[in-house]
């Protein structure tokens, strides 16, 4: 049971970061070249595409009817775009993707 294992947990869990902050260049420079290339290609592809629409009416429809598929599709497209742009900016760290990131947020 979970309750039996709770005493073994520390009072404060250690912080976790799935990747280093963008300014930690040493962390990003250790990525294999193939991974950098893949992340840069994904970011460039997203930056070249128009921003996916996310009208409030989709969320309102979800709130009213409970039908979330259309809102989720639009929201997840934005989230995937943001992840690709942010990762590419972290790899390159030149500011090229910052405007697209700001527009997506």
Regions of interest found by a model, annotated:
Residues 1-105:
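Extracellular glycan-targeting catalytic surfaces
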